[in-house]
Structure formats: C-alpha cells, structure tokens
Amino acid sequence: MADYKHTLNLPQTDFPMRGNLAQREPEQLRWWQEHEIYRKQREAFADCPTFMLHDGPPYANGQIHVGHALNKTLKDIIIKSRHLLGYNSPYVPGWDCHGLPIEQKVEQKIGKPNQKVSATEFRAACRRYAAEQVALQKDGFMRLGIFGFWDQPYLTMNFETEAQIVRALRDIVAAGHVTQGFKPINWCFDCASSLAEAEVEYQDKTSYSIDVAFAVKDVAALAKIMHADVVPAAVDVVIWTTTPWTLPANVAVSIHPEFYYVLVEIEGWYCVVAEELIPALKSRWKKSADWRICGRALGKDLDRLTLRHPFIDRDVLLINGTHVTLDAGTGCVHTAPAHGVEDYDVCQQYGIDLIHCVLGNGLYNDDTPHFAGQHIFAAEPQIIELLQTQNRLIAVEKITHSYPHCWRHKTPTIYRATTQWFISMDKAGLRQKALDGLNEVAFTPDWGKPRLLNMIAHRPDWCISRQRYWGVPLCFVVDKQTGQLHPDIVNIMDKAASAIEQKGVEAWYELSLDTLLSGKEVDRYEKLNDVLDVWFDSGTTHYSVLKKRAELSYPADLYLEGSDQHRGWFHSSLLTASAITGKPPYKALLTHGFTVDEDGRKMSKSLGNVVDPNQVIKTLGADILRLWVASADYTAEVSLSPNILNQRADAYRRMRNTCRFLLANLHDFDPEKNSVAYEKLLPLDRYVIAVAHDLQEKIKKLYVSYDFHLIYQEIFNFCSVMLGGFYLDVIKDRQYTVAQNALARRSAQTAIFHIIEAMVRWLAPILSFTAEEIWRYLPGKREESVFLTKFYEGLQPLNDDFLSMHDWELLLQLREKVNAALEKARNQGIIGGSLEAMVVLHLPPQEYEIAARFEQELRFILIVSAVNVQPSAALSIEVQHAIGEKCERCWHYLPDVGTDHQHPTLCKRCIENVDGGGELRRFA
C-alpha cells in the first residue's frame, strides 16, 4: 500500500502548543526592554491625537495585591487598545508616598520622631522606606506586562512634585478658598491626627443608648408658652444620645422649630418630648401608665428657654435647629458643638461658645468636672452611674449601630474641635463649581454620577491640615496673635516651593523666617509645621503631573479607579481642580468593583481566600490574570478564586490552540507572493473574512466603551464556534488535499492570514505576552512589535453576488440541523464519523436555492461524503451510509475509489490532486 502522507499539505509550526507562560513571559519582558519597544511606541504614535488616562497613585506600601492587578491591567488594556485605534496614549505610573502608614512602618523600625530620632532623620527614613516600596511594586506591575514610563514615574515625594503641590495650594489660597477654623472634625486617637472624609469607614459598634433629663429653669414660662393646664413644680426636657461621653461638653438642646412638642405627665413626672414620638417612647421607657398631655407648642415658640445641665453646674440653652429629625430619640437633641458638625453650626448661629474638654489622646482635660484624666470611652459607665445618682437617667440600653472608624486602625473615631485649615466648600463658590463641572463628565457605570454629585452637595469643608511629620508642609506663615495668614502669603509660598524643589520638604523646616519675611516682621509671625492631607497630594496630580510633563496633556480623558475613589481621588481631584481652574481635571470617570471570592465574600487571611497575584503569575502566568480581568464585568464586585482562574486557563488554551492552528496552516505562505486577490477568493473565504471584519468593528466599539468582558466573549466564541466549529473544520480538506499552490488552497490561506493578522491585534491589549509571541511567528514583513501597529485594515465586508450574510446564516442553521441528524444516525449505528454519511436534504424554496448554489461542494460544507438536495414544502433530513469505499488520502467514502489500478486506494479527486492538474474548487 502506497504512503500518500507526503502528498498532503499537513499543518506545521514551531509555535508551541503549551504556553508555559510562567517561564516564557520573563523572556518576553526582557525582549521588550532590550528592544525599547515602549520608546519606539511613543515615537510611532507621536503625531496621533492623544488619549490621556491619568494614573491614580497607589500607596507605596507592601506587595501588589489582586486589587492592584485588576486596576493596572484595566488601565493597560485601555491604553493598548487606544493605540490600536490610532491614538497616542502615554502612560505615566505614579505612587502616593507620604502619609501615616509609612510613618507607622518607620516608627516600628527606628522609633517615634523627636524621641529616639530627630524629625529630620525620621523624614529621611520615611523617604527611603517609600522608595523601597515603590521599587517592590514597580517590579510587580511590570511583571503584569503593563506598558509605561517605568523609568520616569511620578512620585508625590519627588522634590519637583512636592514643590508643585505647594504651588497648587498657593493657587487655591490666592483664589480665596482656604479658611482657618476651630471646628469639629474626624479625629483618631491612634493617629493623633484629624482624618479626611475619605479616611473614615463605617463599621458596627456597640454603644450605650441613654435618655437623659434636663431640668427647665423657668417652669412657669414654659407652661405659659405651651398653654398647659397645670404649672408643675418641675419639668424636664428629655434628650436621647448614643455618645454619653459627649455630655460634659453639652451646652444646648436643639428642637425643630416646626415640630410640635408636648408637656406630658407620667405618674406625677412632667417632661417635654416631640408629640409624634410618644408611641416609641412608651415602648423604650417601659412606662405603660397613662401619658396625659398637659400642654402643646411648636418648637419655635420654645426657643431660648433655659435648662440645667444634668450633672454640671451649667445653664443650657434650648435652641432651634432644622437638623433635628423624628427618626429616633425624643425630638430633643443633645448639642455639644465641640463634637458634632451640625451641633457646631447651630451653636454658631446662636453665638454659643463650645466647651473643649477632650484631648487628642482621648482623655478628658483637667478642667472636666468629675472625669478629668479619664479616657472618654472608659468613663461612659461612670457617666451613666452619675446620671442615675442625680435621678437624671430615664432609660439605658446597649445598641449596635453603624459608627465611624479609622480606615487604618479600624478603631472608633470621634468628632473633636481643633484649630485646622480648611478648603471651604462655599466661601468662594467651590461647591457649585464642582457640581456644575460634574455635569460635563461621563461616568462608567452611570450610577457613579448621582453618587458623586450627592457627596459633593452634602460634604463639609475639607480639613487639609495634619499634625504629622511625613508629608508636604502647608508652608503657611501666620500671625502669632491672631493666627491669620501673612498678607503676602502667596509670595511666601512661592519662595518655599522654590526651596522645596531643590531639597524636598526638608527645606521648609530649614528655612528661617528672615529668609521669608522682612526683619521687622520676624517677631510677629511664625511658620506652621502642619502637613497636608495626603489626599491633597494625590488630588493635585493633575496640576503637578498632567500640566507639568511635556508628554502628557490636560485635562485627562479618563480617571479609572475602584468605586471607593468617589470619596477619595476622584473627589479630591475634582475639588482642587475646580478651586484652581473652575473645571474638573477629567472628561470621564470609570470605576471598578472590589475583588471577592467566588462566593462573593471579601478576601481576608482569616477566611483563607486571599489570592496572591504574584503566586498566580509564578504558576499560571500573567496572561491568565489579564484574561481574568478582561473577562470580568468590573462594574460590580469581581470574583476571583483558583477555580475561576482554571476556567480562564482553559479558555486561554482554546484561543491559543486556535491561533496555533492558523499559524500551522501558513507555514508555506508568503503574503507578498501567495495572497489571492479578494475577487478571486472562494465564497466561503470571503464570508469568513466578512465575519472577521464585522467582528473587528464590534470589538473596536467595545474597546471604546470599555466593555472588555464582551470582547472576551466575542473572541472566544469566534474561536470556538465560527473557526473551530465551522470554518477551520470545513477547510481542512481543501488545505490538506488539494495541490500546494492550488488557488483553492491559497484562497483559504489568504483568509487565514487576514484572520490571524486581525486577531493578534484584538488579543494584544488583553493577552499581551501571547500576542507578541504570535506576532513573531506570522509570515511576511511587519513591524518589530504588535504594539507598534493599529487595528488591521485588510478585512472587508461581504461584497459578492454568491450569498448574502443572511443567506450564510441560514446555511449555518441548516448545517446545525444536519449535524443533529448525523449525531442521531451515529447513535443508531448507521454511521461512525460524518464522512461515512450521505445526506438527503428535502428543503423549502429559500434553503433549497442557497444549498443548490454549492452544487457538489455542499458536501464539504457539511463534512459528509455525498449530498442529495431535493425541493420540498417542508424541511426534512435523511442520513444514509455513503456508497463506496473510504479513500485512504481524503477519507471520503466514494464509488470511484479503486477504479484506478495505479492508485487503488484513492478516489478520482485525490488522483487528480496527486498526479493531474488538481481539482477545481469554486465555492468551498
């Protein structure tokens, strides 16, 4: 028996079947670096329109985690896809380098500043630690295949950036947005510092819930106002609070001017509460006796009556406040302006001074009656006991409620009045500027817009000062007596910024006043050593980075971060840019969700469900992690687990093997010599090119709309269904059996070439390592790297008279029905493989016309040995065993096998392909 294997055009390629990504990817990284691909990309796209994605700086502390991997990979996918779309999209990665977490790490190593080491030594150690962390994270990000200016990142601790941060504050001061105030702000005892809104998170806390009686001083006046039917000997206004520790600071009780309040008698005791809350109070106070209403009045009529503090010799004013609600409590609100923003605001209206009795470490100061020197939380049981002793406690219980906690220490915070510097939301119209600007910003997903608008509309002034060591100094010079800024503060800050640009933040502490002021002013003024909130550092990178670096542009086209950044970087950037320019620093915001396990649980070491991206890279490779990112609907929580990663690895293998098969069928194809002109391509090949063309147009739109998970689905389905399940299966016969240079074979190779040229670009933003590997195996002259190209332009929509796209869809539907009939026949033992079959098709007019156009080549579309097409009113399919013997070369069952004595095991078609001029294929 002759061996005809040498007459077949079998696929062959050196492109590996297995990715072995963990081993190959580092080699690819080195190749990119050695060949300076990123620099060459910058040069290649320099004259293109720009697309500017500005990197929100991660904090320089610790190894990268899956949240980092998700965020950076999304950014990289966007930037690489924008290059394919013809944009110049430089990427400058950044790091947030100042702040408390770094201070804490350094304290653990060398001790607290001004105790074991000087403040100067401490700041230098912080700078070194931050640099080490940047280097660690940089290696992790680069290993993910992220392209960017890794040798020229921006760091908020770079001298030039620190100087620009001061200049940004200078401009905001000059615009009139900065104020000083003794106001209640979020305070953490463990940080010993104020906290920004973004540094506070809410967790459940168990607290005392108490109702406390405040005695009315002039009962007769109260009774008259309330038109009471009795003038009791004593009356109490009852408040409710979950912060008993704030009672020593109480100076007022607030009631709503438009709510009705009633004088109630309960078993001989008289009290005043909101009328609407009586049913709830009966239950909470457990007083089931008759509640007799003796008098009634609006809150505004009770304004400015005097009460007595329950355990301190102090008069307390009854005041009106519209912040009072009927959601809980008594309708009478305990008011301590040192410990609540609304309390502070309403007392300001009445000219009531606050009482400042809590120190920065959480202890009551020495002037606090009864509790001096005690920690506020530890003193609460004693406060409750004292209230009981004074017969002022009406009810007490413990409740669990949502309470602010420090995001770093996870410990409860308080509101505490301190002298701080603020960016005012309303003094110079900043709030309205920010709100107006947001209406011009595009949001993905769109629910981000009302969320951020609501935050801006209701946020307090921004406290920007911190009493820490490692940060950018405010560079304020103030009057020692009044605390007011020097009248020439803008020029002073200019001088300070110039010094910092040369020596870093240390320059501020080394600057003497006489270098900033004239001689006669030195004794009157002093420098402040407060540093800026780190959210101001990152929130001004639009000023210190985008506007400063020549390769970047302003405003940014896109900011992309996790959904928590509505209250963080998106927020602070909006406020600073609006304060400086009156407009947002970005045209669009995109947010992604947090990573959770496959059961939707937050990742934590205690649950054992943390996925380390570095470990994934070492085992599966970065491209699998990148594919996970692309496949996820990032607008919600993003699930990750070993099981999910294994599923993505399976999908990767499908796509890789599809590309390998395409490459293997191009082993002898030179696109310059062997390409077939479009009009000479077989209809099937024109069709698959059209499918790829339409898919590419869809993929372009999906990249623009950031719907990467849909791109993943489209490419995977194209590989699995259109190529693996149809086209590549159909053309195997043509590829393998016809003559090497036959038009039919070169036609298929031309289509394959166009498809892989397009597909490698579709994949490049997602599977960056694999796409570059594929690129090197493609035939023909080309750019050095896939990342130096744009989307492939060699695809065409369908443009012939043979079949329309709709006709092809009907044919594929018919093919599915034939496959189902073949499977049924296989199960019945009529046939084994599909090539053992002859199919008789009874087709309605439309399907009959389509099928008949293929004549005898329809069998290749259906992958059977024979087809008989008959017109019919209704569609039906018969499957019979094909007549004849199996051809040794093409495996078709045909009657003419054995009719040639020189090739007794071949069919006539194969004999023609081996010895003759080759078969003629016209359609498939």
Curated annotation (Swiss-Prot):
Print the keywords alphabetically: Aminoacyl-tRNA synthetase, ATP-binding, Cytoplasm, Ligase, Metal-binding, Nucleotide-binding, Protein biosynthesis, Zinc
List GO terms (cellular component aspect).
cytosol
* Keyword presence, Hydrolase: no
- Coiled-coil region: none
Cofactor binding comment, as recorded: Binds 1 zinc ion per subunit.
Keyword flag Acyltransferase: no
Binding annotation for L-isoleucyl-5'-AMP: E561
Q: Where in the cell is it found?
A: Cytoplasm
Swiss-Prot/TrEMBL cofactor(s): Zn(2+)
Record: residues binding Zn(2+): C887, C890, C907, C910
Q: Where do the annotations place ATP binding?
A: K605
Give the catalytic activity: tRNA(Ile) + L-isoleucine + ATP = L-isoleucyl-tRNA(Ile) + AMP + diphosphate
Q: What is its EC number?
A: 6.1.1.5
Per the Swiss-Prot or TrEMBL annotation, the motif 'HIGH' region is positioned at 58-68
Among InterPro entries, the record links this protein to: aa-tRNA-synth_I_CS (IPR001412), aa-tRNA-synth_Ia (IPR002300), Anticodon_Ile_BEm (IPR033708), Ile-tRNA-ligase (IPR002301), Ile-tRNA-ligase_type1 (IPR023585), Ile-tRNA_ligase (IPR050081), M/V/L/I-tRNA-synth_anticd-bd (IPR013155), Rossmann-like_a/b/a_fold (IPR014729)
Gene Ontology molecular functions: aminoacyl-tRNA deacylase activity; ATP binding; isoleucine-tRNA ligase activity; tRNA binding; zinc ion binding
GO BP terms in the entry: isoleucyl-tRNA aminoacylation
UniProt-listed Pfam families? Anticodon_1, tRNA-synt_1, zf-FPG_IleRS
Chief site of localization: cytoplasm
UniProt motif ('KMSKS' region) ranges: 602-606
Please give the NCBIfam families that the UniProt record associates with this protein: ileS
**What does the entry note on its domains?**
IleRS has two distinct active sites: one for aminoacylation and one for editing. The misactivated valine is translocated from the active site to the editing site, which sterically excludes the correctly activated isoleucine. The single editing site contains two valyl binding pockets, one specific for each substrate (Val-AMP or Val-tRNA(Ile)).
- Oligomeric form and interacting partners: Monomer.
What is stated as this protein's family in its record? Belongs to the class-I aminoacyl-tRNA synthetase family. IleS type 1 subfamily.
Protein known as: Isoleucine--tRNA ligase
The organism encoding this protein is Dichelobacter nodosus (strain VCS1703A)
Q: Gene of origin?
A: ileS
